Amino acid sequence: ERVMQSVESPSVKASIKSIINNKPILLMTLSSMLSGFAVGGSKQDYYIDVLNFASLGLITGIPGAIINPFSYMAVPWFRRHFSSRFLYIIGDKISGILLVPVFLVGCIGGKKHGLYKNIWVMGIAMTLWETIFMIFYGVRRIIPTEMYNEAMDYCEWKNGYRTEGMTSVAQGLAQKLSGIVSNYISTWIKQLIGYDLTLYVRGTAQSDSTKFGLFAMFTIIPFITTSLGIIPMLFYDLNDKKKEKMYEELLERRAAMSKEATSGDLEALEKLAKAQMEIGNSKSEL
């Protein structure tokens, strides 16, 4: 069980400072924010208005549903062979990456006679997409959480205290901002391609251009617009060597502070609190 990390709660100014000088959190937040600007359409819109088979997802998702639990068992293997940075990127972008070949296959034949309208061909393509995606599902769920926890340890190492609350608020605001912009642009693009939601209800088909637009919005457009999120993570450098040094120093510091904190001496606690808040000022830039 982890000991109490700080005797005094950091001020708002100190909390903001701890986020600004926490490089791992900044990069992960920026990556998430840029990825959140992804513009795309709904898979269900494509199934309904292009393939005319709203329940196709129930069929294409069967193999992936079987693989899903086993994807968590594969995480240790991925950890041994790849860096956390690579796994974070691949876990976040694997869906878009796999949709690129789906788009290329669907484009065969053009807008009017393209395979993107063929339910059998696209059914197979979507099954492969969902199945391969599920292989990385465990990585997608576990690695970002691990890296977030490491970033909080980095915050403690760098500043002497942890600011999970302020960090969560900052990340949440960034994601909401990008989400609002993304939804607005997606709605605008649907209007641009002439998408009319009421046509399906009236039993009327969308035009070929609109159908292809819905297909592109579901496949290639999200991949293109979310790729910017990769750039910040290329500068993520909390690697094994730095983590080893960080945790070695943290363990020593925690042990010393725990000893002081359990002494029950008020003067010692005040001295400890002051020392914790001054760690960020004395720590060299990393």
In which residue ranges do the predicted regions lie?
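Membrane-embedded alpha-helical bundles of multi-pass transporters/translocases
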Residues: 1-285
